[in-house]
Amino acid sequence: WIKFSGISWSADNKGFYYGRYDEPQKGEKFQSLNKDMKVYYHRVGTPQNDDKLIHASPENPDWGFQTNATEDGKYLVITVWKGTADKYRIKFKDLSDTDNPMVDLIDNFENEYSFIGNEGPWFYFKSDWKAPKKCVLAINVNHPESENWKVIVPQASETLDSAGIVGGKLVADYLKDAKTQIKIFDLEGRFVREVKFPGIGTASGFGGKQ
């Protein structure tokens, strides 16, 4: 019973992580509420009944989960959402040992933290933390206190619509005068160049290998 969930492939491409709800009781398929989402790992070629439970939060039945397995295979990042507001909690698990616990990185719903990617223990997010028009923020999971956070790309006069890490660079998609403006930065936040368009328009969906 998969709803409100994408999938995130493991680095070895042998399976993927996803969120699902318990199967409703007989006769309640189209009546029961969406409660108690859980995160599972599905190995390709095996029945869904064999999927491994990765995370659940029964004390918070209204929470939903979006999964991101990092490209280097080291971490599973879970974005926790509640309702429709762009305010998220963030959890992560070190995948080097199956017994490692799920750790709270952001333990409140006060701001947006949209996961972009990672460089080792540094996790990159598009965020409105102290930045109403959004910034790119980096958090070291080994030193997660907010005083150690780094604003990689500060808030600009334009609104940061989306961001991604592609080919070792940050691609920042801004909305300026109802049209797209694309700027490229290195992972330390140094400006590299602006992508010029032949005319007025919009562009989005910048992603690929980090």
Where are these regions (language model features)?
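Peripheral, non-catalytic segments that deliver or gate enzyme domains
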Residues: 1-210
